[in-house]
């Protein structure tokens, strides 16, 4: 019984740590997405004013797409961490 209790505490600690890490990843991904969107807006404006090239716009679009993908992956990791945490606390 003592071994099982120690194991549950270790699992709870790991799940709590993972949950905190993934929540931070979501916050960071949100910030990066906002920055990528702002950059895309600025580059698009500059392009329309003749100050930036199409390559600059495409690069900004790619960065925005990557930021969105990273945000989705962060959300997924956070949901998985929450599921693991709930599993551990229900044991």
What spans do the regions from the language model cover?
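Amphipathic alpha-helical coiled-coil segments
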Residues: 1-70, 77-88
